[in-house]
Structure formats: C-alpha cells, structure tokens
C-alpha cells in the first residue's frame, strides 16, 4: 500500500474508535508508527526477542567504572541462569532472550554455557584495547563486529520475529557511549557523562579526566561515524549496530534501550538514516548523555522510570505498551460498529 494512503487509513481507523480523538495519547502515535513499519492497518507483534550483547573494554582497566571487568562475564552466566532483571522482565512478557558474546574477556568454550540454547558465540576478541593508548578496535575488527551483528539478526533470531529489543553488558561501556555521543554530537564531555554504575564523586572526576584525555588524543583524526565507532566503541556496541541496521531492513520494530544502546543507534542512524522510522525509544535514562541523544531526533521515550541498568531492561518493561497500542487498534470498536454517536 502507498505510504500516504496507509497513513490516512490508519489515522482514520484510530480516530473512529469509540473515544475522543487523541485521548489515548502516545498509544495512538505508536499504533500509527507500528502500522507504517509493518505496512498494514492491522499490525501484530510476533515472536518478540531481546538481544543482550556483551563485551569488555580495555579502558575499564584505567578505573572508569565502579565495578571490576570480571562482572561482565559473571553477568553473562547470570543471564543464562535466569537470574538478572532482564530475565524477570522477559519472562513476565513472554519475550525470547538471547545473550551474545561479542567480545568478553573470558573463554566460554570450556564451559557448558557454550552449549546453552540462548547463548550466541560471536566473539571478535577478548575485550577492546585501551583507548588511552590506541583505538579500541582495528578497522577489520570493527567491520567484523558489524557483520556478525547482521548475521545474528538474520540467522540467530526467529524468522517470524518482527519486534526486537537491544541490550548490552560491558563494564566500562558508559565511557564509550559518552565518547561516541560527545564526538558525534559535538558536545562537551561533562554534558554527556554520568556516574555509570554508581561512581562516587572522586571516581567520577577521575572518569571525566580520563575521558577528556581520550577525546583529546583521538578527536582530530575522526572524520566519519565508522571511525568514531572504531576508536571509542566496543565489540558489543558495534555488533548491536550491525544487528539494528539489518533488523530495520527486515521491517522489524527496533526497541532502543538506554544510554549505551542509544549511542549505538546514533551511529546506526548515521550509517543508515532510514532506520529512524523503525525505532521506538523505550525510556529516558538518568544518564545525562541519553537526554542529548534523544533530543537529536526529538524523540519522546515511552517511559521515564529513573532506569540506569542497561541489559535491555527498558525494552522489556516498555513492551506491554506496544501490546496495548496494537490491542486498541485491532480490538476496540468503532463508533459505527458499536452504534455510538460521535461528537456533534
């Protein structure tokens, strides 16, 4: 159907439901967006998935996080054992969760984890390099991560899946997100850097100092979004970008989580601008950089719950709102079918 014709048809269907026009607020714009993504006036959500990409960061060794980098691989075990917040929310909402080793500094090949049905081995390397010294990734590694992300979207997600959320796990990755955001949006680092997983004031100041040094070292040589990603990103961020772009090409709804996932989306959007129409921004994080990212697209996130967890938790929590948008569009009576008089 012609997009302009579909907009008219969807908007008419929304407006003729037994309610005052616009009274369902964001649910109405969300129903319209989902219908346009799926090119139908009767959309549905099939086989929802959330992918959690895990990777370590060389910069974590410099003290930019409140937690040791071992927490990354420990949380991978926790995800696969069903014990994390994202597990609880996925179970609550019947969402399939898959965990991707994009670049964790740990070998899972000697463990039964390697055979877990929800574990995806896509390791590019055992963590990125320390960006205080050199770029996080080589050009080849960055391309490999992007390609593996696209492969996962194509081969490791159910073929009938039409809605997919993106989460991450990686000690130190809020630092990468801050550097990506500052570099691409031309913002001062202090405007886009928060305390991450809970740094005290002294350690937060140390984080700022380290990130300013990283930016000063590399910024003059960065000309493209790819170069920003290669220099400041992580394997999990790059792989997420590849999966986002591929999923959008497949006509899926893209659920964007918090600060790190949205910094990945920033690069994805620079690489493939059409991806924006598929994106649903699930929540507003307390990380200051996230607010600047959302402002880049004038995005209105579905939730504002003070989240700063990652893992794709915001995607899972917001998912029932998408279900509600679909439910009213498909199941609510129209004025005509219900024999209810419309506004005079």
Swiss-Prot record:
<keyword id="KW-0169">Cobalamin biosynthesis</keyword>
<protein>
    <recommendedName>
        <fullName>Nicotinate-nucleotide--dimethylbenzimidazole phosphoribosyltransferase</fullName>
        <ecNumber>2.4.2.21</ecNumber>
    </recommendedName>
</protein>
<dbReference type="GO" id="GO:0008939">
    <property type="term" value="F:nicotinate-nucleotide-dimethylbenzimidazole phosphoribosyltransferase activity"/>
</dbReference>
<dbReference type="InterPro" id="IPR003200">
    <property type="entry name" value="Nict_dMeBzImd_PRibTrfase"/>
</dbReference>
<keyword id="KW-0808">Transferase</keyword>
<dbReference type="GO" id="GO:0009236">
    <property type="term" value="P:cobalamin biosynthetic process"/>
</dbReference>
<dbReference type="InterPro" id="IPR017846">
    <property type="entry name" value="Nict_dMeBzImd_PRibTrfase_bact"/>
</dbReference>
<comment type="function">
    <text>Catalyzes the synthesis of alpha-ribazole-5'-phosphate from nicotinate mononucleotide (NAMN) and 5,6-dimethylbenzimidazole (DMB).</text>
</comment>
<comment type="pathway">
    <text>Nucleoside biosynthesis; alpha-ribazole biosynthesis; alpha-ribazole from 5,6-dimethylbenzimidazole: step 1/2.</text>
</comment>
<keyword id="KW-0328">Glycosyltransferase</keyword>
<feature type="active site" description="Proton acceptor">
    <location>
        <position position="311"/>
    </location>
</feature>
<dbReference type="InterPro" id="IPR036087">
    <property type="entry name" value="Nict_dMeBzImd_PRibTrfase_sf"/>
</dbReference>
<dbReference type="Pfam" id="PF02277">
    <property type="entry name" value="DBI_PRT"/>
</dbReference>
<dbReference type="InterPro" id="IPR023195">
    <property type="entry name" value="Nict_dMeBzImd_PRibTrfase_N"/>
</dbReference>
<comment type="similarity">
    <text>Belongs to the CobT family.</text>
</comment>
